[in-house]
Amino acid sequence: MDLEQRRILRTQIPGPASQTLHSRRQQVVSAGVGALLPVYIDGADGAILRDVDGNQFIDLGSGIGVVTIGHTNQQVVDAVSKQANHFTHTLFTVTPYEPYVRAAELLTSNMKGDFPKKAAFFVTGAEALENVVKIARLATGRHEVAVFDHAYHGRTNLTMAMNFKRHPYGTNYGPLATSVTHAPMSYPMRDPEGMTGEQAALRAINYLEKRVGADQLACMVIEPYQGEGGFIIPAEGFLTTLGR
């Protein structure tokens, strides 16, 4: 597919075909599955989404971050086609395969740090975090999880507890998972004037030591840059101080 890389509106929004599809959707799709935009996508190329009415939109979300190299990127299309022709799917925990091992090798070889590295792959970020917490609790024998103000981690029961905002994802869904504590995040625009990243990290560490106790902490989960929380970039030195 080769779409002109610009916004083009051919009908009102939503167009008649999208409205028809939306009526069909309301009859069969759970109301719990929301949609931000009232348009139904028919195709995509590069940074452009095309709906069923022929309107073209610039995808500023990059498919929610997972297609930063563009829609229908030819290298990706070729790789998917090659793999689908080779075999479609088998469960790695039943009958493993080489591409999984190769992907783990690629990931771990590019990770920083002088320590043994291993990887596991999951479908979503929330699923990955559920497993992170399970692994950390098993490995440490501890149960407490530390997260940070303004964080967003997912929509499972555990990750909704790890989110900073209760609304909209956690509204009316209690009780959520326990043993999760939110610590103050470095937020240069809101922190006291002149607070450094190191000072913000020590603030969080001191809070967790008092609130949780280092001997109870299984893991600390943090977004290096917070997206849904407000595009918050911590002050320089915050992450490295936490890491130490």
Language-model-detected regions and their locations in the chain:
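PLP-dependent aspartate aminotransferase-fold enzymes
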Residues: 105-219, 237
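Gly-rich Lys/Arg/Thr-decorated short loops/hinges at beta-loop-alpha junctions or inter-strand turns
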Residues: 30, 84-88, 179-193, 224-226
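Glycine-rich loop-to-alpha-helix module at the N-terminal edge of alpha/beta enzyme cores
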Residues: 2, 6-10, 56-142
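Active-site-adjacent loop/helix segments that line or gate small-molecule/cofactor pockets in enzymes
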Residues: 2-45, 95, 100, 200
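Short, small-residue-enriched loops and turns at beta-alpha junctions
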Residues: 66-68, 96, 189-190, 227-229
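Short acidic, glycine-rich surface-loop motifs adjacent to enzyme active sites
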Residues: 214-231
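Catalytic PLP-binding core of fold-type I/II PLP enzymes
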Residues: 214, 232-244
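Active-site and channel-lining beta-strand-loop segments
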Residues: 38-60
